[in-house]
Amino acid sequence: MKEISKKNFDGYKYVDGGVCAAKGFKANGLYCGIKENPTKKPDLCLVESDVMCSAAGVFTQNKVKGAPVTVSQKNLAKTGGKAKGFILNSKNANTCNADGEEKAYKMCEMTAAKMGVKPEEILIAQTGVIGQILPLEPIEAKIDELYEGLSYEGNEKAAIAIMTTDTVKKEVAVEFELDGKICHVGGMGKGSGMIHPNMATTLNVITTDCAVSSEMLKKALTEIVKITYNCLSVDGDQSTNDTCAVMANGLAGNPEITAEGESYEVFKKALYIVMMNITKMLAKDGEGATKLLECTVTGAKDLDTAIIVAKSVICSPLFKCAMFGADANWGRILCAVGYAEADFDINKVDVSLSSKAGEIHVCHNGAGIEFS
């Protein structure tokens, strides 16, 4: 089973619907032919809001960027953070291709024509094999069917269409109250291999019916990515196409969030809940993974130090081997902590290992503790 245990948060309720949980969002996914026959697994999807959205995105910091990353970044810059729709495909990353940007923009044009908006008001993400020429013909042949099939219940089709080596779809949504209005944040993600985001192959689409300005949306997304997707690692390889974008259409009717404050914190927590759960789903479904490993650091001098230490541990191949073999070899944890670029006092380091079976304290103040 690849399901994760979702932690409950006061004031937030998990609901069905993924990217369609928020009011006014439709989605669809279908097979257009990018993936070879005879699989006919969905390989193209579309998410649309009934109205124009505030939008923000964070993208790979790999110097080799996929064409869709460049196009989405340019589109967000041109519009000042606005988007009406998001088109995505799997199987082909459209990366390291001479005509990659031209084709990615063409897909935005095709989508925009159906929605009656400008091409720069469309976001795009692509995932799959790097260096293969992207065939536009299958997409052009199916764009009408894709658009006409948009549905307020189409979230599952969309989530399946972005899968590559994933074995399960990944989506989550929450409902909460904000300034007297019922609001939603929902999302979908994909990724099993080439997972070591630094933004944040992984693609993520987040939708919300909250009214949030583009500036505050980007601020919230950047803050939450730092403690979710950027703390994720499966194989240590940073993708060329990592994309996480959020669209906010304001149809919940709350006063627009334009500055930090209580309303911003309520929204940001909802965003955190959705993104943290998707992060765990991505790790759980990592290629070859048999266990989900989490590292919690307490007592660090600041958040950055805690993140550096935790990521050093979860990225350690020897630590992963120990956990695979259910071997409480805590020395490998201290080894990984030791080579992390963080300041700490070894004489104040404690280590505990926990699982569903229980918890054992294996190291206190930098020294081992007898355990069995």
What are these regions (language model features)?
Residues 2-372:
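A structural signal for small-residue-enriched, beta-sheet-centric alpha/beta enzyme cores
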